[in-house]
Amino acid sequence: MMKQKIKMLIELLKEQEPDVDYSNIIEFLCKYKKGDFIYPMAIQRTCKIDSSNTFKILELCKKVKLVNTKFVLRCPICNCLGDKYYSSYYAMPKYSNCIHCGKENILHYFEVIYEVV
């Protein structure tokens, strides 16, 4: 199933930019299994691509049902991520306390990540 989704992703990528070599991105994505989280910054760092292209690729991954979008709160004080993942922005609490430093965290500080399905 995963190989079929990767194959569909490659086709979509080639439609958009036929002359680009996507092998490093495909290799990166193949390391993940169902339930793993993919962080956009990890793709940028590992594959050496900018954030705009990273999110374009991740949106194509969503299109072929390779990943789902998740939201997680990030503490503005200690910069740590929370331990709860939300399926939408509106599902997140408006206020919560950081599990690491205890400071109040408001909804403005969050990160978009992707869960492999």
Where are these regions (language model features)?
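Short amphipathic alpha-helical interaction segments
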Residues: S51-I57
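Residues at alpha-helix boundaries and short interhelical turns
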Residues: K33, K48-S51, K65
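Generic detection of long, well-ordered alpha-helical segments
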Residues: E15, D19, C47-S51
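Long, charge-rich, low-complexity intrinsically disordered regions
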Residues: M1-K14, M41, R45-T46, K56, ...
